């Protein structure tokens, strides 16, 4: 598959700042890929997300999305391709009801009403929120609010969804609820997903991970490759998945463990299989 995003030698400095927020950042994202971008607070993750759809303009370097180079002439076309779900959904809500809120972006784009109603219904159905169409967004749970925010993006039919710390304010159940929705949408619609996060378990969902540190790319690799550097992640203010900690502890006790990353469920299956052979 071809690349849907290409970033080359991207630099960005905030006005009045003494230090660059992003320094010589380069990477590609394949169509249909799930890419996680992790790093400590202030590492440049959200700045990078905002440079990808023109909320911020690169100081130098280039950003290409769906074959278009980001510029004043292309920014609105690129924003039609990229939807961002932010950390706090309350800051995105503008409609009196869930359905009104999902329709808001379509109204701004002049989508005819019959088509708008169809898209709103489809989007709410895809995220499992049809029964809440007439509810006030403020009365929903955190996970439900993020599902509505995702529906508002999906209704606009983007090619790329960026999750900018979208699960950081949710409890574990709400986090899994939202990630499950994104997983299904990615598979059903062929979406490309960029997950900006410091949550290691969320990053584990990705095909590849970019590790940012002080605005620079520290490493790019698969979850297995990134999580194998446990002490390095801890030094950078990040965590290591529980399953990786357990694998390391078992390996130190002389138990043969696979090198590939395993989530909790796969690790339990492996340990049961190992136990049955003893």
From Swiss-Prot:
UniProt entry keywords in alphabetical sequence: ATP-binding, Cell membrane, Membrane, Nucleotide-binding, Translocase, Transport
Keyword Translocase appears in the UniProt entry: yes
UniProt-listed Pfam families: ABC_tran (PF00005)
SUPFAM superfamilies: P-loop containing nucleoside triphosphate hydrolases
Annotated compartments: Cell membrane
CDD domains membership: ABC_cobalt_CbiO_domain1 (cd03225)
EC number(s) on file: 7.-.-.-
Membrane topology: Peripheral membrane protein
UniProt key word Nuclease: no
Record-linked Gene3D superfamilies: P-loop containing nucleotide triphosphate hydrolases
Family: Belongs to the ABC transporter superfamily. Energy-coupling factor EcfA family.
The protein's role, per its UniProt record: ATP-binding (A) component of a common energy-coupling factor (ECF) ABC-transporter complex. Unlike classic ABC transporters this ECF transporter provides the energy necessary to transport a number of different substrates including 5-formyltetrahydrofolate and thiamine. Expression of the complex plus FolT or ThiT in Lactococcus lactis subsp. cremoris (strain NZ9000) allows 5-formyltetrahydrofolate or thiamine uptake respectively; 5-formyltetrahydrofolate or thiamine are not taken up in the absence of FolT/ThiT or the EcfA1A2T complex. Deenergized L.lactis subsp.
The protein, known as: Energy-coupling factor transporter ATP-binding protein EcfA1
Organism the protein comes from: Lacticaseibacillus paracasei (strain ATCC 334 / BCRC 17002 / CCUG 31169 / CIP 107868 / KCTC 3260 / NRRL B-441) (Lactobacillus paracasei)
Taxon lineage: Bacteria, Bacillati, Bacillota, Bacilli, Lactobacillales
């Amino acid at each position: 598959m071809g690349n849907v995003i290409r970033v080359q030698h991207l630099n960005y400095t905030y006005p009045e700042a003494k230090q660059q927020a992003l320094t010589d950042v380069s990477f590609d994202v394949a169509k249909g890929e799930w890419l996680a971008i992790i790093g400590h607070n202030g590492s440049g993750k959200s700045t990078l997300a905002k440079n990808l759809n023109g909320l911020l303009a690169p100081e130098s370097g280039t950003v290409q999305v769906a074959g278009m180079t980001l510029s004043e002439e292309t920014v609105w076309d690129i924003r039609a391709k990229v939807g961002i779900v932010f950390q706090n959904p309350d800051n995105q809500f503008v409609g009196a009801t869930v359905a009104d809120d999902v329709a808001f972006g379509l109204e701004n784009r002049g989508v005819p009403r019959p088509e708008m109603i169809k898209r709103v219904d489809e989007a709410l159905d895809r995220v499992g929120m049809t029964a809440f169409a007439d509810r006030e967004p403020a009365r929903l749970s955190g996970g439900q609010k993020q599902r509505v925010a995702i529906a508002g993006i999906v209704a606009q039919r983007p090619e790329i969804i960026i999750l900018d710390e979208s699960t950081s304010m949710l409890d574990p159940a709400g986090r899994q609820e939202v990630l499950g929705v994104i997983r299904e949408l990615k598979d059903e619609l062929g979406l490309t997903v960029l997950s900006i996060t410091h949550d290691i378990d969320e990053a584990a969902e990705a095909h590849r991970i970019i590790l940012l540190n002080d605005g620079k790319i520290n490493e790019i690799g698969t979850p297995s490759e990134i999580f194998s550097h446990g002490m390095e992640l801890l030094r950078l203010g990040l965590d290591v998945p529980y399953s990786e900690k357990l694998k390391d502890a078992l390996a130190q006790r002389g138990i043969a463990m696979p090198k590939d990353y395993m989530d909790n469920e796969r690790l339990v299956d492996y340990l049961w299989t190992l136990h049955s052979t003893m």
